[in-house]
Regions:
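Glycine-rich ThDP/TPP pyrophosphate-binding loop and its adjacent helix/strand module
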Residues: 143-145, 150-183, 188-246
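Conserved thiamine diphosphate
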Residues: 1-5, 61-97, 152, 207-246
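General structural feature for long, well-ordered alpha-helical segments within catalytic domains
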Residues: 10-14, 21-22, 30, 77, ...
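Secondary-structure transition/capping motifs at alpha-helix termini
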Residues: 20-27, 48-54, 94-95, 150, ...
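N-terminal amphipathic, basic-rich helices that act as targeting or association modules
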Residues: 2-32, 36-42
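Terminal amphipathic helices with adjacent charged low-complexity linkers/tails
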Residues: 32, 36-67
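N-terminal leader/propeptide and maturation segments of large enzyme subunits in energy/redox metabolism
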Residues: 64-140
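Carboxylate/His-rich catalytic cores and anion/metal-binding grooves
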Residues: 27-37, 43, 80, 84, ...
């Protein structure tokens, strides 16, 4: 809410919609560019928390050239910590000292552990049981509580513009897409370098005239979507909020 974007900028509308869907359990790695300027200017930030849960996105800004790697590192880091916590929970559940309530909460958590939407309430219920075990002196429970913020399934997103995704950061982006890991990428495709004044990018269309590319682009637009689809296991969607007013 209340971003510092330029008048008429549509990027914030997409970011707002994504955060409304996933924001309570969302990590964002943001490439330097327009989306980092309106997304994290000094002394203020448009990313906020849900008024009921008081939870919201965790946001970080990366350099232009390594945002995909940065976001992938965020994903792998939280995944590793979560896996460590789950291993401790499995050990606790196998103990004859575990309560029936804990075992039931853990079983329910494991049923939804890969579902971002459904897993959050199950994780909260499980944490309540772990706190009881910790109060009773269980050392494994105390270790799990140190990582409790990672228990709920997270939705990890990598944000950036076409200058990052199509050009300077493409190598890293391709590596992340090829990994097959559960990472989401949002490319704000303005079809030129918007933040630096208007240079042509590989997302610019043939013949396109930009402020600092007045002669017109001589080659066609790179099809990033088709490149991603060529792997056969990457889901690709192209969206335009203004395409259908209804």
């Amino acid at each position: 809410e209340f971003s510092g974007s330029c008048a008429g900028c549509a990027e914030t509308s997409y970011a707002r919609l994504i955060t409304q869907l996933f924001g309570e359990h969302m990590y964002i790695s943001n490439a330097t560019g327009c989306s980092s300027i309106w997304g994290g200017p000094a002394a203020t930030a448009p990313y906020t928390v849900n008024k009921d849960s008081k939870q919201g996105p965790a946001w970080a800004n990366s350099l232009f050239e390594d945002n995909a790697e940065h976001g992938f590192g965020m994903y792998l880091g939280q995944k590793t910590l979560r896996d460590q916590a789950i291993a401790k929970l499995e050990k606790m559940a196998a103990s004859d000292k575990a309560s029936d309530e804990f075992k039931a909460a853990f079983a329910k958590f494991m049923e939804t552990k890969d579902n971002t939407k459904e897993n959050t309430p199950d994780a909260q219920a499980l944490i309540a049981e772990v706190e009881k075990a910790a109060a009773a002196g269980c050392p494994d429970a105390a270790e799990v509580l140190e990582k409790k913020q990672y228990l709920a399934k997270k939705s990890v997103w990598i944000f950036g513009g076409d200058g990052w995704a199509y050009d300077i950061g493409f190598g890293g982006l391709d590596h992340v897409l090829a990994s097959g890991e559960n990472v989401n990428v949002m490319v704000f495709d303005t079809e030129m370098y918007s933040n630096t004044g208007g240079q042509a990018s590989k997302a610019s269309n043939i013949g396109e005239v930009c402020q600092f590319a007045a002669a017109g682009k001589e080659i066609s637009k790179k099809s990033l979507a088709e490149i991603a689809m060529s792997y056969g296991y990457v889901y690709v969607a192209q969206i335009a909020l203004g395409a259908n007013p209804n």
